[in-house]
Amino acid sequence: MDSVFSNVARAPEDPILGVTVAYNNDPSPVKINLGVGAYRTEEGKPLVLDVVRKAEQQLVNDPSRVKEYIPIVGISDFNKLSAKLILGADSPAITESRVTTVQCLSGTGSLRVGAEFLKTHYHQSVIYIPKPTWGNHPKVFNLAGLSVEYFRYYDPATRGLDFKGLLEDLGAAPSGAIVLLHACAHNPTGVDPTSEQWEQIRQLMRSKSLLPFFDSAYQGFASGSLDTDAQSVRTFVADGGECLIAQSYAKNMGLYGERVGALSIVCKSADVASKVESQVKLVVRPMYSSPPIHGASIVATILKSSDMYNNWTIELKEMADRIKSMRQQLFEAIQARGTPGDWSHIIKQIGMFTFTGLNKEQVEFMTKEFHIYMTSDGRISMAGLSSKTVPHLADAMHAAVTRLG
């Protein structure tokens, strides 16, 4: 007898996660995985931060800890500390109780909860997202019932920001449209606006009543400074206007598999923020009821303790500095080989990813001939590189450019 699901078509492999599947199936000893967005040590190993291990040990040793359900909005301390981390301790939004923060399932979950709330309670159902953006963004917003449009962001000719196109497209967006903004370390391009450009974006968006929805996946991971990487968000919050912010602790605390994140919604008044929170609860309750305890407890433990917080900032800067060092080493290795073209974008871009400018054919060539795995758009994770593997990557890029043009 046929299955009632026999007509279900096989879904395509996720383009990013599929890179790792292909990498795992390759027996080559020289293979490199530059596809996945997770930090690796110089030895190519996953890293658990020392401060995270200490926090976990502290939690394990606490006999008063139980495994009861937590509130729909999550752990109160975690929410307060997360808002403080992204907005700044002295933010008027916090002191005036104009922000509601809800613990969610990492960045993706925070985006989805925010999108579901907006679909029901906001007068516009169109969201503008940068072209290109993280591959999951359009799916998250479409499945929440929002209509996705794109605004120009990256200029392949300069391998930098298409600022003119960005302003034109947002200027042409309907009044009140939602706009997704990467708070820092734009994924996949590594290209961020300058602080002056952010101010122009803010002025334009406020003049058209466009609603900012920030995705902050890399705070502290881009520049090495938590405050510097939050400046774009704080610029918008400082004007008293409203916005949404999705936070993730996957990258900056290395808590990838713990799924720890937060959604903050900054409102015009404490009364509105309270009503908004009551409705966000109605989004969460039928979706996953309440969030998990462990990861958020780790984050709250670290953010509450001045010693642990300081240790975290040191480890975070070490990760950011290693990525910057990989950029420099790769740039110098390409220069040394005399590879045609201007490769300065490798050291100008910021954060975990570099948008190399390599095309699909060149990427396929590098995978086949050199066992280097990356997404077909030419994005490479700098965190997956080491001093030992940079020469092999530079050789592959040189061969791809010189042989295929």
Curated annotation (Swiss-Prot):
Q: What is the effect of changing A250V?
A: In asp2-12; loss of pyridoxal phosphate binding and loss of activity
Gene3D superfamilies attached to this UniProt entry: Aspartate Aminotransferase, domain 1, Type I PLP-dependent aspartate aminotransferase-like (Major domain)
Per UniProt, the enzyme's principal EC class comes to transferase
Q: Mind telling me which InterPro entries this protein's record contains? A: Aminotransferase_I/II_large, Asp_trans, NHTrfase_class1_PyrdxlP-BS, PyrdxlP-dep_Trfase, PyrdxlP-dep_Trfase_major, PyrdxlP-dep_Trfase_small
Cofactor dependency: pyridoxal 5'-phosphate
Q: Which residues carry this modification: N6-(pyridoxal phosphate)lysine?
A: K251
- What if the gene is knocked out? No visible phenotype, but slight modification of the amino acid composition. Growth defect, when grown in vitro.
GO terms (molecular function) for this protein are:
copper ion binding; L-aspartate:2-oxoglutarate aminotransferase activity; pyridoxal phosphate binding
Task: State what changing P292L does.
Answer: In asp2-11; loss of pyridoxal phosphate binding and loss of activity
Q: Which effect does the record note for changing G254R?
A: In aat2-1; loss of activity
Which positions bear N-acetylmethionine?
M1
As its record notes, the protein acts as a catalyst of:
L-aspartate + 2-oxoglutarate = oxaloacetate + L-glutamate
The record's subunit annotation is: Homodimer.
In terms of PANTHER family, this protein maps to: ASPARTATE AMINOTRANSFERASE (PTHR11879), ASPARTATE AMINOTRANSFERASE, CYTOPLASMIC ISOZYME 1 (PTHR11879:SF52)
Q: What else is known?
A: Several mutations in ASP2, but not all, suppress the root UV-B sensitive (rus) phenotype. A loss of ASP2 activity is not sufficient for this suppression. In eukaryotes there are cytoplasmic, mitochondrial and chloroplastic isozymes.
Specify the protein name. Answer: Aspartate aminotransferase, cytoplasmic isozyme 1
Species this chain originates from: Arabidopsis thaliana (Mouse-ear cress)
Query: Gene name, please?
Result: ASP2
